[in-house]
Each structure stands twice: as C-alpha cells, then as structure tokens.
Amino acid sequence: MSSLVMGCTQHKTDMPRQLVKALPQYPAYAAANYIKGRVDVKFDIGADGTVTRIEFIRSEPHHLFDEQVVKAMAKWRFEKDRPRKGVKKTFIFSPSAP
C-alpha cells in the first residue's frame, strides 16, 4: 500500500473555500518500485469554482506523477464567484514500506 502526503503553500490570503477535494492516485509503477516524488503546481480558480490553467513548476521524477495530479485537481471545486490566479500547491508522494 502506498500513501500520499500533501503539503500546501498558499500565497493568497482570501482563498475561496474548497468544497470538493480529491487526492491523486499513486501510479502503479511508482508504487511497485517504491518511487518517491514531488509535484509543485500553480493554478487558477475560475469564477465557476473549477481549477483551470495548471502549470507544473517542479515535477520529480520528471512527469511521473503529473497525470494523476491533473486528474485529481479536475475534480476539485471551490466556492463560486471567487476567482483566483496563481494559487500554489505541493504534492508529496511517498510509498509505504513493504
């Protein structure tokens, strides 16, 4: 079994409340090979409360976890009518010991 530890860095003080949150799946290849990773993203929150324009700032190992991060963030929902730009988030992937 693998676990996902998530840290968050927010540089906006008046963030809309997050209503729906989904965690990224741990990729099977990474879990089977006990690969750790980190993904830092910057994204916007649209007026409709959805996540838009995800930009990868850092991804280690390169692109291994990106797809799962995008899939999870596509499910996120925030309060409507409170758009924000340049919100930062860090995902830390750490496999469980065998």
What residues fall within each predicted segment?
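Short proline/glycine- and basic residue-enriched helix-capping loop/turn segments at helix->loop/beta transitions
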Residues: 9-42, 67-98
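A short acidic/small-residue loop/turn micro-motif
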Residues: 28, 58-63
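Short, acidic, Ser/Thr-enriched surface-loop or helix-capping motifs
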Residues: 45-46
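C-terminal motif of bacterial Sec signal peptides marking the signal peptidase cleavage site
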Residues: 5-7
